[in-house]
């Protein structure tokens, strides 16, 4: 461990309850650091950190930073935050989350998974496979890994797996040995000027690996294939294309999982089973993880075991349960491509109908991808929209869920509804649902609360419910 890092024994995290921050806090606590943090509201996540030895303050106040050697902030924290201002006054270093993640990664061999879609699931599968291979990896992931029950873990092995977030360009601070790119898409257009700008960033990210490292790239994605000529490092491609180094074939999508064959550089590795989550996009995510493991010389048998043990990630096609014949699924999808992939995956699960409650996330994203959103819900038999989750943004004139519902209707959807309140949305879905249907709550805001409520209410008798 570097002496200089050890001098910074007390570290304070502003927004410690956030999904990316809590994972870093957990690793630091397990490394023996004194950790404090603050968040607007306490939550099960902050309670977990308190139990691990963190001191967590509710609300932000200047006094919270006293005695800290460094302050870590997520991209959601602005310069006007009283804790940031106090740290500046006291000349305490204020560092972005991505920078601290990069420092932690230097301590081991880094494996960084980037991409517009699929990175949380892929990172989690990599962790599952390396754990099955007895490599005891450390990981920091932007979602709860179901079999580990946590977003982060400090392992004794030499590999550090992180989800690399391109949303604010901080993934360029990372220095991984293996860089994975699952997808590149028009996303985070408040930070990037164009798709080419995003691709340039991914090229920089991939070329940051050392000469003995590897870039693992999805050949099925045109926007990823587009960066290959600019990559100056060893490349392993994966996909259903026979031009890939790791070829997926014979994929069968059944229930909540899949079965498929993998062939690596001409060698048949046999059949693999991924029990969760469903969809061809998750077969690709599993192949990305297999490519990482193959590069690290993990035997195919252990890769097979790691995939077979994978229990999914929180809020990624998260099956909450079945009540009175109705299946409730919660999903984090907030980009049109993700929503379409989730609905296509749900179609393979053989439900009678798909009833969708969608909460758009951010006014800017809704505005930038308006036309795409209006065409993303064709596979939803019934679509209910509730108000946009602002995520600290100010409203934009004309950008409302009500107007989006109108645009979806104009694009040809015959069964789309808008309700201002989450409660009315839930009521409508309860009246609509019949045995054999699935209700999907989709969005990156607080829509998963609705999935919990639906689970409760589906189990209670209501006079408004359809007679079966």
Region annotations inferred by a language model:
Residues 9, 14, 49, 186, ...:
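Adenine nucleotide phosphate-binding catalytic loops in nucleotide-utilizing enzymes
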Residues 4, 27-30, 50, 64, ...:
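Phosphate-binding loop of NTP-binding sites
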Residues 1-100, 222, 244, 249-250, ...:
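N-terminal leader/targeting and accessory segments in enzymes
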Residues 7-19, 24, 34-40, 313, ...:
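Active-site beta-alpha connecting loops in nucleotide-dependent enzymes
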Residues 55-67, 150, 421-424, 429:
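Short acidic low-complexity segments
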Residues 65-70, 158, 434-437:
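Short acidic/histidine-rich motifs immediately flanking catalytic phosphotransfer sites
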Residues 385, 459-468:
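Short, flexible loop segments at boundaries between secondary-structure elements
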Residues 213, 381, 437:
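Glycine-centered, small-residue-biased loops immediately flanking beta-strands
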């Amino acid at each position: 461990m570097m002496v200089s890092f050890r001098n910074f024994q007390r570290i304070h995290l502003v927004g410690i309850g956030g999904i990316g921050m809590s994972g870093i806090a957990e690793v630091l606590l397990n490394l023996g650091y004194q950790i404090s943090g603050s968040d607007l509201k306490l939550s099960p996540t902050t309670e977990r950190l308190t139990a691990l030895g963190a001191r967590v303050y509710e609300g932000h106040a200047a006094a919270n930073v006293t005695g800290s050697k460094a302050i870590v902030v997520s991209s959601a924290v602005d310069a006007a935050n009283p804790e940031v201002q106090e740290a500046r006054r006291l000349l305490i270093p204020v560092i972005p989350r991505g920078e601290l993640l990069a420092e932690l990664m230097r301590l081991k061999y880094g494996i960084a998974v980037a991409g517009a879609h699929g990175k949380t699931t892929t990172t989690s599968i990599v962790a599952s496979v390396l754990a099955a291979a007895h490599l005891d990896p450390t990981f920091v992931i932007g979602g709860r890994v179901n079999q580990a029950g946590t977003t982060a873990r400090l392992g004794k092995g030499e590999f550090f797996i992180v989800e690399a977030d391109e949303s604010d360009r901080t993934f360029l601070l990372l220095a991984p040995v293996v860089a994975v790119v699952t997808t590149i898409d028009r996303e985070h257009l408040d930070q990037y000027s164009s798709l080419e700008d995003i691709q340039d960033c991914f090229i920089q990210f991939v070329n940051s690996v050392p000469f003995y490292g590897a870039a693992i790239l999805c050949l099925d994605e045109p926007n990823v294939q587009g960066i290959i000529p600019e990559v100056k490092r060893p490349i392993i491609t994966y996909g259903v294309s026979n031009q890939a180094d790791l070829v997926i074939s014979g994929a069968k999508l059944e229930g909540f999982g899949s079965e498929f064959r993998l062939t690596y550089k001409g060698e048949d590795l046999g059949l693999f089973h991924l029990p969760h989550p469903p969809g061809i996009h998750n077969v690709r995510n599993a192949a990305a993880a297999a490519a990482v493991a193959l590069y690290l010389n993990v035997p195919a048998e252990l890769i097979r075991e790691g995939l077979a043990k994978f229990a999914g990630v929180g809020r990624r096609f998260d099956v909450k349960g079945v009540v009175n014949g109705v299946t409730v699924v919660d999903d984090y999808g907030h980009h049109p491509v993700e929503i379409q992939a989730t609905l296509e995956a749900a179609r393979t699960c053989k439900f009678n109908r798909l009833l969708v409650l969608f909460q758009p996330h951010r006014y800017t994203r809704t505005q930038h991808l308006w036309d795409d959103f209006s065409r993303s819900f064709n596979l939803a038999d019934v679509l209910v929209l509730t108000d946009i989750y602002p995520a600290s943004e100010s409203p934009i004139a004309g950008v409302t869920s009500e107007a989006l519902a109108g645009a979806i209707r104009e694009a040809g959807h015959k069964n789309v509804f808008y309700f201002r309140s989450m409660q009315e949305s839930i009521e409508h879905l309860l009246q609509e649902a019949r045995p054999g249907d699935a209700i999907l709550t989709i969005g990156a805001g607080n829509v998963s609360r609705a999935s919990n409520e639906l689970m409760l209410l589906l189990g209670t008798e209501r006079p408004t419910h359809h007679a079966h």
